[in-house]
């Protein structure tokens, strides 16, 4: 299983939110590039970077910082947050981003994500499915939608998008464990490359996700709060 240390960027700082609430924020560093190099040096094989300003404002506020991360590290970097135009995808890919994660725009227009996967390749486009219960949220998790998780994901899978980043918003940043029940339902869908996000509290959570056959898992707060170590991640992640 691929394990992605998370770097969430807000106003140029490395932060973590609780349940996606911008008012409930902990700062873990003021240099995202330095943080990326740290995780790489400790054995990370991938990085998951989020432009939180972009997620809330709808455009790529931290694009330059993300570009510098991609220039600094040698490992693949996936990026999400406020990516809602084809030009934004193109810019990230040209800046060295390995995989672009589309969220709110894909909920509003699944066709947008489907076309992006066709243009840039299925390995380089993912869709972020961020949910309150079984309902998909949008716009920095502030707004609800009429989309239900499983039918929405099935539509994407049937049309050429296979990498899905699933977040249970109620668990994100809470160290309460992932939503294993929903992970099981999603993992059962044919052809899915499922990445678990939100709630990882310890190495055993990662081991369980790996045993379930998931493609990947993202860990943020558990890593920053030393509930899980990079040594454990190196041991669990794909050899």
State what each model feature region is.
Residues 2-6, 46, 74-78, 98-101, ...:
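Structural preference for beta-strand elements that scaffold enzyme active sites
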Residues 8, 39, 47, 79, ...:
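Conserved, mostly hydrophobic/aromatic
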Residues 12, 19-23, 90, 97-172:
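Conserved anion-binding
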Residues 46-64, 104, 165-176:
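Glycine-rich, proline-tolerant flexible connector loops at the mouths of alpha/beta enzymes
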Residues 53, 58-120:
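Glycine/small-residue-rich loop that forms an oxyanion/phosphate-binding "nest" at active or ligand-binding sites
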Residues 60-67, 142-151, 176-184:
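Charged helix-capping and loop-helix junction motifs
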Residues 70-73, 77-99, 181-216:
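Catalytic cores of alpha/beta
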Residues 83, 94-112, 168, 198-202, ...:
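Glycine-rich phosphate-binding active-site loops on the catalytic face of alpha/beta enzymes
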